């Protein structure tokens, strides 16, 4: 964002281009802004600077969609949440496998104690703890080092879970959202499936970013009450949109869980059931 005089006389235009090749010029009046906009030069937007802040921001956002909207046009975030962590991570793996048949999928596990390190193998050198550290060190930007932390199985890509619970409990929701956006923007996944732990700060902030939120359901009475409390919180705090995107799933898991689970996941009753539900979404 630059003022009109500096844009016209004082700078090399290439030096101020942003990642999406856009420049906002603050003009003295609407006439000058109109002249700039009439050129229809890609990435160049003129706005009058003499207006209330909320109107100024509105003028900009109407013409340049924000980064989150652009990313989500390409990548859909799929959230998995629940009050039984074992059921939740199982459902998350099944969801990731099902979405992998729809497009390129990345699985991110935000559990403090994942329990699936032998199912989704790591090379022992890099995991989500390292990714958070690299992301912060790089000023919250994607790097080649982060790319090298991503592993793959026959179905989807994944980042091995943290090895230290503090690496999840201390990270804030803004950092997680920023990491998701950078992964989506740079790697162009169709879907990023996120196992949303209760251990992270403000899990509903991550849910709010998701196109769909699947809730694991064991059928337990207290768990059902907790789910109702969660819905009430969303409604009373103005987050009804999250409720509209939520779906509870009771896997009624009959399949054996062991190190070879992912190799046979497509032949399990759980996968068949979830796939049939996704076909209706």
Residue spans for each PLM region:
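Phosphate-binding loop that captures ATP/GTP phosphates
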Residues: 102-158
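Conserved catalytic-core segment of NTP-binding enzymes
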Residues: 177-268
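NTP-binding/hydrolysis catalytic cores, primarily Walker-type P-loop NTPases
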Residues: 262-281
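Walker A/P-loop phosphate-binding motif and the immediately C-terminal alpha-helix
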Residues: 74-116
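Extreme N-terminal, non-catalytic leader segments
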Residues: 22-77
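Cytosolic-facing regulatory segments adjacent to core modules
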Residues: 138-152, 160-196
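Short, well-ordered secondary-structure micro-motifs within conserved domains or adaptor modules
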Residues: 1-35, 211-215
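Short, well-ordered alpha-helix to beta-strand connector turns
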Residues: 7, 20-22, 42-43, 102-103, ...
């Amino acid at each position: 964002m630059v003022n009109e005089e500096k844009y016209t006389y004082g700078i090399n235009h290439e030096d101020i281009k942003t990642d999406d090749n856009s420049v906002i010029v603050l003009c003295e009046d609407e006439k000058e802004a109109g002249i700039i906009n009439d050129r229809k030069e890609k990435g160049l937007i003129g706005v009058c600077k003499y207006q209330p802040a909320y109107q100024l921001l509105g003028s900009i956002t109407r013409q340049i969609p924000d980064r989150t909207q652009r990313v989500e046009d390409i990548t859909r975030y799929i959230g998995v949440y629940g009050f039984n962590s074992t059921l939740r991570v199982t459902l998350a793996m099944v969801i990731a496998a099902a979405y992998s048949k729809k497009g390129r999928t990345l699985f991110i596990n935000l559990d403090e104690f994942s329990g699936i390190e032998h199912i989704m193998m790591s090379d022992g050198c890099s995991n989500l703890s390292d990714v958070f550290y690299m992301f912060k060190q790089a000023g919250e930007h994607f790097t080649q080092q982060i790319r090298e932390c991503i592993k793959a199985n026959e179905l989807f890509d994944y980042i091995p879970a943290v090895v230290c619970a503090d690496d999840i409990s201390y990270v804030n929701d803004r950092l997680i959202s920023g990491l998701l956006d950078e992964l989506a923007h740079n790697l162009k996944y169709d879907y990023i499936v996120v196992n949303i732990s209760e251990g992270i700060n403000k899990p509903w902030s991550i849910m709010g970013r998701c196109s769909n939120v699947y809730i694991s359901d064991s059928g337990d009475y207290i768990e059902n009450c907790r789910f109702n409390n969660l819905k009430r919180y969303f409604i009373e705090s103005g987050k009804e949109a999250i409720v509209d995107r939520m779906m509870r799933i009771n896997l009624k898991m009959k399949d054996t869980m062991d190190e070879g689970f992912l190799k046979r996941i497509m032949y399990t009753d759980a996968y068949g059931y979830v796939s049939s539900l996704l076909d209706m979404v």
